[in-house]
Amino acid sequence: LSKRARLYTEMIASPALVHGNRARLLGYEKGVNPVALQLGGSNPAELAQCAKWGEEAGFDEINLNCGCPSPRVQSGDFGVVLMLSPQKVADCLKAMQDSVSVPVTVKHRIGVDDQTSYGFVRDFVGTVHEAGTRVFIVHARAAWLKGLSPKENRDIPPLNRELAAQLKADFPDSIFVVNGGIKTLSECQTELGRFDGVMLGREAYNNPWLLTEVDHALYGDPESTLTRDEVVEQMADYVDLVQEREPLAARTAV
């Protein structure tokens, strides 16, 4: 749908890569690059190995998720709970950076529970910055670890993109990508006036046809001539490819 937009995988827990079906977890349709592998974990050595596997699989970026608030993720000591341990995050990212040549980035929130002051997220970014990370994807909401479901955590905590913009001002040598609540390419254009990039989450799967307009609207490329019928044909081919690699029934069997 877009040749320019960077696609991020769903978060893959590092233990799943170490002990699971690595070929399936790291498999993707070639030709859709740039693609980023998003990892979840808190073991520096394990994450470094997973980052290396990701680079070998052809990923253009390795991202560490420090934004997911789900209880299951919390219990595994990764996701947004890691924002409460910034030095641990810095150690993980440093180990990942030392193992690969592609960029290593971090995705995080602007706060956790009652830790919502600018100083909290500034100190988190500062600690990670000192370890060498220079690309920050900021979901401009705090996460509430108790009382809200992951879905509610994407809506109920208020957006504060101004706080994210202050991070950009305070760390001018770094790249900041804003995420959260952006639904139109017009909003993307507005936010690109103060951020280096914009990440679409739910809108990308609620309204995927929007992606056909990205290259023209944001990069000045010629308008897409892709039709919906062509997209459906490509999707059918992809399903056939996945089925050849591993029968879909094997993934859904209980």
For each predicted feature, which ranges?
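Short secondary-structure transition/capping segments
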Residues: 19-22, 74-77, 117-118, 148-151, ...
